[in-house]
């Protein structure tokens, strides 16, 4: 199934940011390349390209499916760009569009977890029209402006010009003195040379990118607080129940349809989907809703019956024969990431420092004859192609041609499992155990995790 972000720029390909330099363009570092991405990963970029070509309203919402190509040479590090077909990211290229918002009925008594968020429910939430009117000032449209090179004859030089690459939505969650802050999706702002924000009253502000995180697909923007009169209240997504009514407010297909409201229910909780990002394929925990989510909705809020934000709209299934499958990032997952982005401009994560290939991609004869595996050892874990110098993996004693079968006590079947454990269960500075198979023998190694950098793999 193809998952795509609601709003995404056309310019950024979903390749891992830790791509091995000497490899071909479609090769990925193991840390970010998973070949058999369970049900084919959702691609932010796929969504961009689709919404770009799909600017002809709903008809063009059919997801552009990218077929994952399997390389004949299994030794190539994980294929770059396994993109499933059908998940659409809500960025509308050129035309602003980002309406993937659903309403959530989160508990009005949510405990305050951060000073950056307010939690009071809207007093007039019993009437949807009144609630929407109250929330409208907190919803914004976001335009991603990028520079393109004009070189008609390919002779070098030429001129450059700025153009709108894509649009999305966002929600104002904090006002501090003369500044206001907006939550949106990373794929809405990725690659921008300039970001502009359109407020509910039509006023336009130039926005500053405070921080963004590819893995969670979240970003925080800063604008002048001069024209900001209200901030959105956040609810407790852990209190949601399937069947609760929700609404989505956003800008499907651009500012032309700004402030569009759609209604639905929470169709499912704690859904896990694979998403192909510039950091590789990652698993996302999302809320499922049947509220209409169209290109341009990405980054907009999903709102409960109390008028509180319980999710940030991010993805929808765009596949022939499939309707009303939209996904939002739960508010309880959003808040801690936003806190880090406000404080540091980024999210620090641990890494091992290895390039890997899923064992499902390694020929059985190679597993037996070269790696020395046998019996139930065959086909398990991830193959270590290369170990980075001075990395936690090297210091722990991991070697090329080892097969990692457990990390932090959990079974490993794919590189996605490695990332999931690293990003969800562990943090920088943690000590952990790694179980490997080496020439048919099991070894348990100890590693101390360090900070992931732009040039480091998983």
Swiss-Prot record:
The record lists the catalysed reaction(s) as: Acts on substrates that are at least partially unfolded. The cleavage site P1 residue is normally between a pair of hydrophobic residues, such as Val-|-Val
Function text: Degrades abnormal exported proteins and responsible for the propeptide processing of a natural pro-protein and for the maturation of a native protein. It also plays a prominent role in stress (heat shock, ethanol, puromycin and NaCl) resistance during active exponential growth.
- State the phenotype upon gene disruption: In contrast to other bacteria, in which inactivation of serine protease leads to thermosensitivity, inactivation of HtrB leads to an increased thermotolerance and an increased tolerance to hydrogen peroxide. Inactivation of both HtrA and HtrB leads to growth defects and to thermosensitivity.
Transmembrane regions listed in the UniProt entry = 72-92
Keywords of the record: Cell membrane, Hydrolase, Membrane, Protease, Serine protease, Stress response, Transmembrane, Transmembrane helix
Judged by the first EC level, this protein's enzyme class is hydrolase
Quote the subcellular location field of this record.
Cell membrane
Q: What is its EC number?
A: 3.4.21.107
Q: What does the entry give for GO biological process?
A: proteolysis
Protease keyword on record: yes
Q: What induces it?
A: Induced by heat shock during exponential growth and by heterologous amylases at the transition phase of the growth cycle. Negatively regulates its own expression.
Report the membrane topology from the UniProt record.
Single-pass membrane protein
Q: What is its main location?
A: membrane
Membership in a protein family: Belongs to the peptidase S1C family.
- Descriptive protein name: Serine protease Do-like HtrB
- Which top-rank group of organisms is this from? Bacteria
Species of origin reads Bacillus subtilis (strain 168)
